[in-house]
């Protein structure tokens, strides 16, 4: 079966995104974006949306999208992962877009999705408690929503706030007015991942789902897991590329250190991990069953963590300086591994 991330259209999309990011999202630009008030380069995000249509990829055409799918969104996420470019792609375009589509609520989709697809509306999804699991942190009652949701992607700067909450019938998806909540940015290990805490206290909210959200939430979790796996694969591959390039340039004992057999073996081992991660991502996209998705979470996370660790080891002392990007890949590796639940829990399942 054809790899959905390696079709002619996918390769053209990859080339377009990579060309733009190479020109506009180099290491200095990435650091500047991380330190900006929004935590990302808004002009770059606008260009990605207007010229390439990245936010519209997984949204149907009748809601203002491109009518592609998760595989195409994963192509973009992998490229963003390569350069560690901070962007609202994961939280707004993928998670919130998917959440709205799974409500079965045409009115809400017609009202909210066109702005998300255009990249002019930034949406955030709140659900997780402090343990990072998918059990909704918020509780819905006649009085409104109560509780505290953690790890909300772009939650403090979002224009639209969606929340998954526990209900008497299981779970529901709610649209929450911004003036009714307290939103606080939190410092995280990864400076390129903007996270927030969202607190509700009898906050009035509008329920969007039709017929319950328990099963859609499971599918949304799978989508989120696959999307992060794509980012991990792209970042792991780039970490390996940078390491190989460095070992070809760095000389010791009169020859490039990459010519030493011990280092060749270590880089070959990273390559095997990266290719295994690509295969796991492919299986998750093509099969879509929960086991394949959980496998991708574990394999892709481990591959990225291994590539980032070896990047530091094989670069030597320069890799532990603030000016070098190795620590940013390392932080992204460990941050993404825990973003949608502990990999250890996935293994136990």
List PLM regions with ranges.
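FAD-binding core of flavoproteins
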Residues: 88, 110-237, 241
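Positions in alpha-helical segments
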Residues: 94-98, 215, 227, 265
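Short histidine/acidic/glycine/proline-rich micro-motifs that form metal-
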Residues: 63-64, 100, 151
